[in-house]
Amino acid sequence: MTEIDYYLVDVFTSLKYGGNQLAVFVDFKNEISTENMLNIARELNFPEITFIKENQYDKIFNVRIFTPEYEVPFAGHPSLGTAFIISKYLLPKPKKSIILNLKHSNITIDLTSINDIDKSYFIMEQAQPDFITTYKHQEIANGLGIQLEVLNIQKPIEEISTGLPYIIIPVINLEKINQVKLDSRKVIEFLTLNKKYKTNSLTGLSTSLFFITDETFDKSNSFNTRMFCIENGNLIEDAATGSANGCFLAYLLKNKSTEISAIVEQGFQMERKSYIHLDGKIENNKYSLKVGGQVVDVSKGKWKV
């Protein structure tokens, strides 16, 4: 029986058992089939897991990302967590930048320190945003079954993607975002009606919901956020979502200022505090979307295939 090395990390946190969980599998011999990669994702039931499939001369690493439902072309916290494992365990010595070859595109991840990987910030440059569509506030309130007064009607509701699609939904304050409760059937109906569900979307992926407010638990942070998605027919909340925050950064650059630096808190309502650092600007009509955070080493082991 073959055994594969795997590692567990928490991403977007400096403390173990905070942030978002990730399992990283090292499969340079391609011994795990696509079917079994999905089976492993379902067995662990983490938001995502990754498989490092190839090391191209210590410069580019081919990586595949799976949720318990399907393979995804890009995801934020899995990219950062995988770069951490590569830096700490797979390279002869850490490098200032790592390139991950993902299904959607190549992602470059920079390290703020190569001398102390455990304290380094891992920062990814996300792809150019696709501003897909906007929604009326009443349409979102009716479609998701929430009260209109929960929404900040002074700010637009917009669907954006840098590899995965999210609807950015501004909420009036922290109290209201804490109280957000969604029904999975209602969300699936809304997504299906708008051709945003996996069964009828152009990409075969379901669009997720990203609620944001500029009131925070920790006053040193800039925004509080919550991300909800449908997975295997169930409504799931995510503790820290790098891809959603990249879309949110694009949203801020488009609607607020052409240069942004911010710290986003996420997962606070789940008791998994996460801190996502955003730095972005628009220059020559191009978006620079940098999303970063720290990664904590949790455990490692062997997986029997």
Predicted regions and their residues:
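Active-site proximal loop and beta-alpha junction motif in alpha/beta enzyme cores
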Residues: 1-74, 80-305
